[in-house]
Regions:
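Short, surface-exposed coil-to-beta transition loops
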Residues: 9, 44, 69-73, 97-102
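Glycine-rich portal/gate segments that line the openings of hydrophobic small-molecule binding cavities
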Residues: 43-88
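Short, highly charged C-terminal tails/helix-capping segments
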Residues: 144-153
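Beta-strand/loop substructures that line and gate deep hydrophobic ligand-binding cavities in soluble
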Residues: 86-136, 153
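Hydrophobic ligand-binding cavity/cleft-lining segments
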Residues: 1-42
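A short, structured loop/turn motif at beta-sheet edges
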Residues: 18, 51-52, 77-83, 105-114
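Hydrophobic pocket/interface hotspot
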Residues: 21, 31, 57, 76, ...
Length: 153
């Protein structure tokens, strides 16, 4: 069992609607455009999204410099359209009890939308040292995908 007290939180304030932000997380075509750090790509053919409770998602990030592939996936634990996604995040098919859990919260903030990304259970896993930077970069890719400027929180 992972230590769910270990992790981090990232925020972005986006000039986009909650519906646009939700679609970026739940539409496979959009996911392929941004769900990777700056030094990687996510081929569209590698992406599958079944955004419902107990549904699964999968994608493969490809390092642009080396061609190394990083299959990633998980299971949706909570799905509240335009508001909240909770999912496991790790190797496809990994035991949910031993997999980090991500919570994405989408909330209106006046004319903007606040995105809060929280990842728990990363301490002691291979690659821990790069998870924060990787997710920060991926969220910056999301900002670019939405064609917006974000305020880092």
């Amino acid at each position: 069992m992972i230590d769910s007290s270990r992790g981090f939180t990232l925020e972005r304030l986006l000039d986009a609607t909650p519906e646009q932000v939700w679609a970026a997380w739940t539409d496979a075509d959009e996911v392929a455009e941004w769900w990777h750090p700056a030094d990687a790509t996510t081929p569209r053919e590698s992406v599958s999204v079944d955004a419902r409770v107990d549904g699964r998602y999968a994608y493969t990030m490809v390092n642009q410099a080396t061609g190394e592939e990083y299959p990633t996936g998980g299971q949706y634990l909570e799905v509240v359209p335009h508001d909240r996604l909770v999912f496991t995040w790790g190797n496809p098919g990994a035991d949910p009890e031993d997999t980090p859990v991500a919570t994405v919260t989408i909330a209106s903030a006046g004319d903007l939308t606040r995105l809060t990304f929280d990842l728990r259970g990363v301490d002691g896993m291979a690659g821990d040292e790069s998870f924060y930077d990787g997710w920060a970069s991926a969220l910056d890719s999301l900002v670019a995908h939405l064609g917006q400027t974000a305020v880092h929180g």
